[in-house]
């Protein structure tokens, strides 16, 4: 399917926070309770619609283990968006956010949009990190914030789409150089065939998709 833009994402965070499950829920709309550890990097893709334009999201799911950190770093450079994930039932994953964020900002382009995600919101009885703590961390570091559940699909769609909306807004504002693919944005065939509009940011519903 033709698209106006392709946005590259990277999903980062500690092992076991649900990165692969979030990707699977977004691309395939299913939950896999037992998931093998990601070894290196896995990949998924889906089409969405923003402001009447088809946007292809190309999403790289990275391993959380320290031994794979150098591989993860190489994917920061070509990403327009990052989903930084922690597990609300494991405080250590929240405590490690600063390290992940420093790594991301050191190795990515300065305009990369970062969405902070507190995953496993369905496990409220086991919560160790308050929602207010996530909100405060996001405010302090200039991030977008949502709590999600890869199991129930709560806010999963919104997390990926809202990140794309932020990227799209930056394109409209001229913040991103869309002719430089190192920024994680590629102009698609649909954009070339039509005049780019500079209207408001509307929509964001799925237009179909699948896992690649």
UniProtKB/Swiss-Prot annotation:
The small GTPases Rab are key regulators of intracellular membrane trafficking, from the formation of transport vesicles to their fusion with membranes. Rabs cycle between active GTP-bound and inactive GDP-bound states. In their active state, drive transport of vesicular carriers from donor organelles to acceptor organelles to regulate the membrane traffic that maintains organelle identity and morphology. It is found in: Endoplasmic reticulum-Golgi intermediate compartment membrane; Melanosome; Endoplasmic reticulum membrane; Golgi apparatus membrane. Regulated by guanine nucleotide exchange factors (GEFs) which promote the exchange of bound GDP for free GTP, GTPase activating proteins (GAPs) which increase the GTP hydrolysis activity, and GDP dissociation inhibitors (GDIs) which inhibit the dissociation of the nucleotide from the GTPase. A motif (Switch 2) lies at residues 63-72. It is an enzyme of class 3 (hydrolase). Belongs to the small GTPase superfamily. Rab family. Switch I, switch II and the interswitch regions are characteristic of Rab GTPases and mediate the interactions with Rab downstream effectors. The switch regions undergo conformational changes upon nucleotide binding which drives interaction with specific sets of effector proteins, with most effectors only binding to GTP-bound Rab. It catalyses: GTP + H2O = GDP + phosphate + H(+). GO terms for molecular function: G protein activity; GDP binding; GTP binding; GTPase activity. GO terms for cellular component: acrosomal vesicle; autophagosome membrane; endoplasmic reticulum membrane; endoplasmic reticulum-Golgi intermediate compartment membrane; Golgi apparatus; Golgi membrane; melanosome; membrane. Keywords: Acetylation, Cytoplasmic vesicle, Endoplasmic reticulum, ER-Golgi transport, Golgi apparatus, GTP-binding, Hydrolase, Lipoprotein, Magnesium, Membrane, Metal-binding, Nucleotide-binding, Prenylation, Protein transport, Transport. Prenylated. Prenylation is required for association with cellular membranes. Residues 200-212 have a biased composition (Gly residues). It holds the Pfam family Ras. This is Ras-related protein Rab-2A. A motif (Switch 1) lies at residues 37-42. The modification N-acetylalanine is found at residue 2. It is a lipid-anchor. The lineage of its organism: Eukaryota, Metazoa, Chordata, Craniata, Vertebrata. Mg(2+) binds at residues 20, 38, 61. Its cofactor is Mg(2+). InterPro entries: P-loop_NTPase, Rab_GTPases_membrane_traffic, Small_GTP-bd, Small_GTPase. Interacts with PRKCI. Interacts with TRIP11. Interacts (in GTP-bound form) with GARIN1B. Interacts (GTP-bound) with HOPS complex component VPS39; interaction contributes to obtaining a functional HOPS complex that promotes autophagosome-lysosome membrane fusion driven by STX17-SNAP29-VAMP8. May interact with VPS41. A lipid is attached at residues 211-212 (S-geranylgeranyl cysteine). Its EC number is 3.6.5.2.
């Amino acid at each position: 399917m033709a698209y106006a833009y392709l946005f590259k994402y990277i999903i980062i965070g500690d092992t076991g926070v649900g990165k692969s499950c979030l990707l699977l829920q977004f691309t395939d709309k299913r939950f896999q309770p037992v998931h093998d550890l990601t070894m290196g990097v896995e990949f998924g893709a889906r089409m969405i619609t923003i402001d009447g334009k088809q946007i292809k999201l190309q999403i790289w799911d990275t391993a959380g283990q320290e031994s794979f950190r150098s591989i993860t770093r190489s994917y920061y450079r070509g990403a327009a968006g990052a989903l930084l994930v922690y597990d609300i039932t494991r405080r250590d994953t929240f405590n490690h956010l600063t390290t992940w964020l420093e790594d991301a900002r050191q190795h990515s382009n300065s305009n990369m949009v970062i969405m902070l995600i507190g995953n496993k919101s369905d496990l409220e009885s086991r919560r160790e990190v308050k929602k207010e703590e996530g909100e405060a961390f996001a405010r302090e570091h200039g991030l977008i914030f949502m709590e999600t559940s890869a199991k129930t699909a709560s806010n999963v769609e919104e997390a990926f789409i809202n990140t794309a909306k932020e990227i799209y807004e930056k394109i409209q504002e001229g913040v991103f150089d869309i002719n430089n693919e190192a920024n994680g944005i590629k102009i698609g065939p649909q954009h070339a065939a039509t005049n780019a509009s500079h209207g408001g940011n509307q929509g964001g519903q799925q237009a179909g998709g699948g896992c690649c």
